[in-house]
Amino acid sequence: MTGKLSKRMRMMRDCADTSIQYPVLDGLELLKKMARVKFVESVDTAINLGIDARKSDQNIRNNVILPHGIGRDIHVAVFTQGDNIVLAKNAGADLVGLEDLYDQIKNKNYRPDVVIASPDVMNVVSKLGPILGPRGLMPNLKMGTVSHDIAESVKNVKSGQIRYKNDKSGIIHATIGKINFDLIQLKENLEALIVSLKQAKPILYKGTYIKKVTISTTMGRSISIDRNSLCVVIN
C-alpha cells in the first residue's frame, strides 16, 4: 500500500510542473518557494550533454570560478615545500605541508574539500591515489590543482572555483550556491558554469552539446529550465 504524501511533498508536486521548462528566474523562485526544511539547502544543477561519455575525447573535465561562490568555506590542503609554504598560507590555505600532511590524510584524520600540489611533490602525493582518487581529490594539472603558482590556485578555490566533470551518462552535476542567495546571484553562477562548459566543448564534437538544464535543492525536486532564458548562447 502506498503511503500518503507528506505536506511538503504535496506542495512540491503542486508547485512544479515537470512538463514545463521554466524561465530561469521563475525556476529559481520556485525552488525558494518549495524550500521548507530547517537548514539552508544547496542549489544544484544537472546539465545533460550530448557527448558520448564512452569516448575519452568527448569527456569533459574543467573548473570555473563562480562569481558569487557556493555559500560555504572550502577547506584547502596544499602539498608543497620551501617558499611555497608561506605563500600558500598567506593565500588562505587551511593546511599546508608535505610528509605531515601526507600522514594526516593517509590516516584519515583530515578530509579537505580540495587538494592542491606543486609539481615537485607529486611523487609524494601520488602515493595517496587510493584515498584521494575515489573522492575526486587527486591533484590534476588540467583542473588547476597541480600548479607552479600555488598562491593563485589557492585564491581561485577560496574565491568560488568549482571543479566539474561528466558522469557515465554525460551529465554534469554541480552546486551553484545556497537557497538563501538572491535570484540574480544564482542565475549568474549558473550562466558562468554554462559559459565554462561551452569553452570545454570537444573541438570535433557535432550535434546538440547542451541538451537539458535542470535545477534542484538538496531535498527538493528537479525543475527543468528553458535554455533560451539564460543570458548565454547554449549551442
UniProtKB/Swiss-Prot annotation:
InterPro entries: Ribosom_uL1_bac-type, Ribosomal_uL1, Ribosomal_uL1-like, Ribosomal_uL1/biogenesis, Ribosomal_uL1_3-a/b-sand, Ribosomal_uL1_CS. GO terms for biological process: regulation of translation; translation. SUPFAM superfamilies: Ribosomal protein L1. It holds the Pfam family Ribosomal_L1. It comes from the Bacteria. One of its GO terms (cellular component) is cytosolic large ribosomal subunit. GO terms for molecular function: rRNA binding; structural constituent of ribosome; tRNA binding. Keywords: Repressor, Ribonucleoprotein, Ribosomal protein, RNA-binding, rRNA-binding, Translation regulation, tRNA-binding. Part of the 50S ribosomal subunit. Binds directly to 23S rRNA. The L1 stalk is quite mobile in the ribosome, and is involved in E site tRNA release. Belongs to the universal ribosomal protein uL1 family. This is Large ribosomal subunit protein uL1. It comes from Blochmanniella pennsylvanica (strain BPEN). The lineage of its organism: Bacteria, Pseudomonadati, Pseudomonadota, Gammaproteobacteria, Enterobacterales. The gene is rplA.
